[in-house]
A protein has these predicted regions:
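N-terminal glycine-rich phosphate-binding loop and ensuing alpha1 helix
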Residues: 65-128
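ATP/Mg2+ or Mg2+-diphosphate-binding catalytic cores
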Residues: 292, 296-300, 556-596
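Conserved alpha/beta core of the MobA/IspD/sugar-nucleotide pyrophosphorylase nucleotidyltransferase superfamily
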Residues: 63-74, 224-310
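Conserved core of the sugar-phosphate nucleotidyltransferase
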Residues: 177-252
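Conserved beta-loop-beta/alpha segment of the NTase-like Rossmann-fold superfamily
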Residues: 129-202, 206
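Active-site activation/catalytic loop segments of kinase-like enzymes and analogous catalytic loops
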Residues: 505-534, 547-565, 584
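ATP-binding pocket architecture of kinase catalytic cores
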Residues: 322-429, 436-452
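An alpha-helical support segment within catalytic cores of ATP-dependent transferases
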Residues: 302-319, 420-476, 487-488
Length: 596
């Protein structure tokens, strides 16, 4: 094996074009950054080993000695959505952003190829079809990661683990001012920059030789991971074994590959590669604007065009963009413009299958007129994007705060008795059957008890259908996160995607179905909504709609899971309430029929 200094000198000579004149020792010293005396000694060693020919040219034996250090390939990770880079990442993969006149991933590919690395694999996922052109244009290989939306980047490396050898691991959204790639690399490393002051990045601790001995998230005045990494064959072999062994663990799938490395840092030998600067990861549009002034006035974004048209502003006045993680179906972000804060709602993929956007637009206009949602500014009835005022430090309704619950119930009552005619109809049974149709052929609805649950709900539907309850304007998604309270205590009922003419039981049923109420508390809520003690017919009807709403949202949740969107604990709550309240309601229907 070569020493590090021998490798540095030999690899420097090896990558020079063969038709160029031989280098002097002084030129080698300048090119490698080593002292002239050191170079003189190294040249003598390499001459004696037969790796140089006496005229500072590499021999065949020298190339053979370098062969174990030659880079085999590169993997570019381009599967993720980069949600922090809203809103541009809503429209195309971040890899396709044009920075300083060049598409990020194209620049990276060209830099790899300029270094002599032609075996390049790109792992795609989010908006994958927009990246397929790279295969023909640059002769790269494409691998599709179908798990990009539910697992982190270990899922990408798992797909290409058989390709991990002497391999550069790259992110598709890095911008390197200078080409960092080399045809020969001595050992595994991670690129790093120095942070003066605090940083939230992965910070490294190293020993005297530069081996990484510790990694922690966040630090101060520290070298942190950024940009590319390099796996040598030894690292790749050990890392692949660990990845295969631990991949099924939720900790591994949810974390980054760097987290797996950090847990096994003693087994995995990797060194720090320090750079003075010139490596960029743009985590927000504001960061990109600071680097490329073209984005101040021209974002090449239809979302920005939408905002400018509604707020009568220019792109450079839109700033402070922060993704909002609440909500299971849509993508939203907060932004500032003209001294005020707003929210832009971008319709989630697939929502057009079950949401009537024109009906939502009419409902939002009605809600504003009724004083139920003063946040609303504009909605595009055809495409579903929406702009609203942002409520600073908003709180959501507390199901166990009597004053808040009474306010929410009064708002629902105001809507139900308003006489407003909405364009759409929310037939909950029709919606239930729609989700059942969509779930056909999926695994998520194939479980013990599902058929029995559906038969129970069919029986309940037959009873509810016999109740004579006039349809009225309903919100149909009236659970506590949609009741926002500002700092002055004013409540807003937001998100009218499901609104339509419906049985008022849809709203009360949903309100209770998403709570942790006992059945006694649920009955009290029904009475508070009605403003009087419910009759037997009223109580059974509203209890039945708690079950029906729970079943609807349970199926909705299964559909989200089938689309790889994690619903969480609500799924169990809805399943439990569907069974529990269906039994209660059916018992009351049976009792009254027996009495009659």
């Amino acid at each position: 094996l070569l020493t590090k200094n021998q490798f540095a000198l030999l690899s420097y000579i090896a990558v020079r074009p063969a038709d160029e004149p031989a280098l002097s020792q002084r030129a080698i010293a300048q090119g490698t950054g080593k002292a002239l005396g050191t170079v003189n000694g190294l040249v003598k060693q390499l001459d004696a080993m037969g790796y140089l020919d006496g005229a500072n040219r590499i021999t065949d034996a020298g190339r053979a000695a370098l062969a174990p250090y030659r880079v085999d390939n590169a993997v570019i990770m381009a599967a993720g959505m980069s949600s922090r880079f809203a809103p541009l990442s809503y429209e195309k993969p971040k890899a396709l952003l044009k920075v300083k006149g060049e598409v990020l991933i194209e620049r990276e590919i060209r830099q790899l190829q300029a270094a002599g690395i032609d075996d390049i694999t790109i792992v795609v996922g989010y908006m994958k079809e927009k990246l397929f052109y790279l295969e023909d244009r640059f002769h790269v290989k494409i691998v599709i990661n179908e798990d990009y939306h539910r697992y982190n980047n270990p899922s990408t490396l798992m797909l290409v683990r058989d390709r991990l050898k002497n391999t550069f691991i790259c992110s598709s959204d890095n911008y390197f001012e200078q080409n960092p790639f080399e045809l020969y690399v001595y050992q595994a490393y991670y690129a790093s920059l120095y942070s003066t002051g605090k940083t939230d990045e992965y910070c490294m601790v190293t020993n005297r030789k530069g081996r990484i001995t510790g990694v922690q998230v966040g630090g101060s005045d520290a070298w942190y991971m950024i940009g590319h990494a390099y796996f040598d064959r030894s690292f790749s072999e050990k890392f692949t074994q660990l990845l295969e062994r631990e991949y099924d663990s939720p900790v591994t799938r949810a974390g980054l590959w760097e987290d797996l490395y950090a847990r096994h840092i003693r087994e995995l030998e990797m060194y720090i590669r320090k750079y003075p600067g010139g490596i960029h990861e743009f985590d927000s549009l504001d960061e990109l604007r600071a680097f490329d002034s073209a984005y101040v006035t021209n974002t090449d974004s239809y979302i920005f065009d939408n905002i400018c048209a509604v707020l009568h502003c220019t792109p450079d006045s839109i700033h402070g963009i922060i993704p909002i993680k609440t909500g299971l179906t849509n993508l939203s972000f907060k932004f500032s413009c003209g001294g005020r804060d707003y929210v832009y709602r971008h319709p989630g993929a697939g929502t057009e299958a079950y949401i009537d956007r024109p009906a939502e637009a009419r409902a939002m206009e009605a809600a504003k007129a009724l004083g139920l949602d003063d946040t609303f500014i504009y909605i595009d009835a055809a495409r579903g994007w929406k702009i609203s005022h942002y409520i600073e430090d908003a709180a959501i309704l507390d199901y166990h705060n009597d004053e808040q619950v009474d306010t929410a119930l009064r708002m629902l009552r105001r809507l139900h008795t308003s006489g407003v005619q909405l364009d759409g109809r929310f037939d909950i049974w029709e919606k239930i059957n729609g989700f059942l149709d969509r779930l056909q052929g999926t695994d998520v609805s194939d479980f013990t008890g599902m058929q029995e649950l559906h038969e129970t709900m069919c029986a309940l539907h037959a009873r509810l259908k016999g109740d004579v309850v006039p349809l009225c304007a309903c919100h149909c998604d009236s659970y506590n996160p949609n009741f926002l309270i500002d700092k002055q205590g004013k409540m807003y009922l937001i998100d009218w995607e499901y609104a339509g003419m419906a049985d008022p039981g849809c709203d009360i049923g949903t309100f209770i179905a998403c709570s942790d109420y006992t059945t006694e508390e649920a009955e009290q809520v029904i009475a508070r909504y009605l403003g009087h003690a419910p009759t037997g017919a009223e109580l059974r009807h509203y209890l039945g709609y708690v079950a029906m709403a729970s079943y609807f949202w349970f199926l909705w949740g299964l559909y989200q899971e089938a689309c790889a969107k994690h619903v969480g604990e609500y799924l169990y709550i809805w399943y439990k309430y569907a069974k529990q309240y269906a039994q209660l309601a059916l018992e009351r229907y049976d009792q009254e029929e027996a009495f009659a």
